[in-house]
Amino acid sequence: MMTVLSHKLNIVHRLCPFGFMQTLNRLHAVALMLCAIFMVTMFTSCIDEDEQPNTPTGNFEALWRIIDQHYCFFDYKQQQYGLDWQEVYVKYKERVSDRMTERQLFEVMTNMLSELRDGHVNLGASYDYGRYWAWKEDYTSDYSDSLERIYLRTDYKIASGMKYRVLDDNIGYVRYESFADAIGEGNLDEVLSYFLLCRGLIIDIRSNGGGELTNAERLASRFVDEKTLVGYMQHKTGTGHNDFSELKAQYLEPSSRLRWRKPVCVLVNRGVFSAANEFASMMHALPNVTLVGYRTGGGSGMPMSNSLPNGWMVRYSACPMYDSQKRQTEFGIEPDISLHLDDADTRRGVDTIIETARNVIKGK
């Protein structure tokens, strides 16, 4: 088993990876660093007093306690579906013994974490990655790559992670599949210049599972002309379920480069998660933007990670983020116009959600 000191250093490394911190803007970076500092202090002091042995029982106890002290959505999920973390402990504790195999333990612990219903909660071992994906898998997709090919055709343009073209009714269409695909200011200048004479813009982020928050913010900054309140953030201040800081306002600064003032529709579905969910939340706060599609997948907690005595990694939501009205978006954002893909439309090669967005922009 690693020493307490090396365990602490490992936690600091996992909580504050340099590359991840570099991707956040100043406000998010400060908030996340404060969150990490508090969590390192709390968790390392806990290790000094209650370090668990590297046994199935010890790893189970360590996992339950990490989540108990640092997870950020207990109260919200108790309200939403009756989550009781102490009851979860009792339920799964009886399934753990020091005679079970490593893979049996992994299954039990993954099932326990699934009680949180959080796509940002994972258990990582060398042979598997425990996850909860029901937030998207239990719902219809409301997106079709075959329909995308019909609308983009074969002569679409590509600017880094964005595919784009002008539709037949002079409406710009951008398909952005993942915020893990970087976009530069030059990319955005070229795309918006290309659409300069268009009557409106459709940004399709359906099934975008997230990525780098800075990409989401860089894109959103092209749609505001002044510093705009887009949300709030908190961090844990102690190990209790209700130990949180005051809400800290998060603002979107306008880009100093080319900006868009015409109507915008953002297309969403259940596959919109994490940084993509945050993009939808930011855009939802803007007056010229309409969200069209189905409720997003959520994932509004900034994730942190710790290691267990056996070396497994556990990731969890640590810092809650809210929309501009101080509402939770952990379980998704309801669009302004809610609808599914219509089966009859799909058979005809028509994307119901894109067509609805076109009508919104045309004022129909």
Residue ranges and their predicted role:
Residues 1-53:
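Bacterial Sec-dependent N-terminal signal peptides
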Residues 45-235, 242-248, 313:
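Flexible, low-complexity junctional segments that flank or bridge functional domains
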Residues 175-179, 204-208, 233-236, 266-271, ...:
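Active-site-proximal beta-strand/loop segments in catalytic clefts of secreted hydrolases
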Residues 198-202, 259-265, 285-287:
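Short, surface-exposed connector motifs at secondary-structure boundaries
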Residues 212-263, 301-305, 318, 322, ...:
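Gly/Ser/Thr-rich loop/hinge elements
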Residues 276-294:
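Cyclophilin-type peptidyl-prolyl cis-trans isomerase
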Residues 335-364:
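Low-complexity, Gly/Ser/Thr/Pro-rich intrinsically disordered linker/tail segments
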